[in-house]
Amino acid sequence: SAILIVLVVSLASCSNRQTGEVSVKEDLIAKQLLQGIWVNDETEMPLMRIEGDTVYYANPQSAPVPFKVVHDTIYIYSNEPVAYKIDRQTEYSFWFHSLADEVIKLHKSENAEDSLVFTSREVEVISTTPEVIKKDSIVTYMNTRYRGYVYINPSKMKVFKTSYSENGISVDNVYYDNVIHICVYEGKKMLYGQDITKKMFADIFPAEMLDQAILADMNFMGVDSKGYHYQATLGIPESSVYNLVNMIIGFDNTMNIEKAE
C-alpha cells in the first residue's frame, strides 16, 4: 500500500504541472511508430500526420503542435496541453482515449493520395473582420456637438484558441485580432485619437482569457462631465463568451479602463 500511495502522489504532482510537462523519459520507440499519416477507421478520412516531434492535423485551420509519448500516454502541447491514454499501438494501428472518453481508432495510411491533404504547411488563419468597419455617432453635451468615430481594423496579430471536436479531440485554431482606432471631434477639430489593442486590458483580465480573446467591437457611448465614453467588446472567437470594457477618456486625455459590471 505504501508503494501505491507513493505512485498516486507522483502521478498527481506530474498532472498538476501547468504546461503538462512530464519528468520521466519519453518513449522514442513509440514516437517512431507514430511517424506517418493516420486515418480514422470509421470514416477512412486522414486525421493527422506525425512527423518528427510534431502533429499536423488534416484541417488546414488547425495549428501543428509538438507531442511526447510517455508510458501509455501521448501528451499534446497545444495552447491548452492535453493528454490522451493510448489503448493500442502497433506499427499500423493506433487507438487512444479522447477527452470525451471515446476510443479513437486509427490506422496508418498506405494510400499515397492521403498525403495531398497535408501539402500546405501554412495554417489557414481565420479573419474575424475581413475589412475595415467604420462607425460614427453624434452626441450633444453642454450645447456642444461631439462626433465619436470607431475604425475596426483587421491586423496580422494572431490569436490561438483551443477548441474540441465532437469526439473530444483538442485542436488549436488561429484567428487574426483587430486594432481599433477611436477618435473624438468637435467640428473639424480632433480632441482625442488613439489605437486600441487588447494588450491595454492586461490589468483587468487574466492572461489565460486575454490570450484567447479578440478585440471584437467598440462603441462610442457619449460625453459627460468625466469625459468621452467608449465601450469595448472582448470576445472568444466562434463562441458566445465575451466581456465588456468601459473606457473613459478625460478632457485632459487621460484614459481610465475598467471591466463593465
Predicted regions: what they are:
Residues S15-Q18:
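Bacterial signal peptide processing site
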Residues V22-P46, S120-K135, Y141:
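Tryptophan-anchored aromatic micro-motifs
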Residues L191-L210:
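Surface-exposed loop and turn segments in beta-propeller and other repeat-based domains
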Residues E102-T162:
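Surface-exposed beta-loop interaction hotspot
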Residues F94-F96, Y146-Y149, K226-I236:
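Short beta-strand elements that form the blades of beta-propeller/WD-repeat-like
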Residues G20-V24, D101-T129, E238-E261:
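Edge beta-strand at a domain terminus
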Residues N40-A83, V171-K188:
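N-terminal glycine/threonine-rich, aromatic-flanked beta-hairpin/loop signature
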Residues S10-S13:
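C-terminal motif of bacterial Sec signal peptides marking the signal peptidase cleavage site
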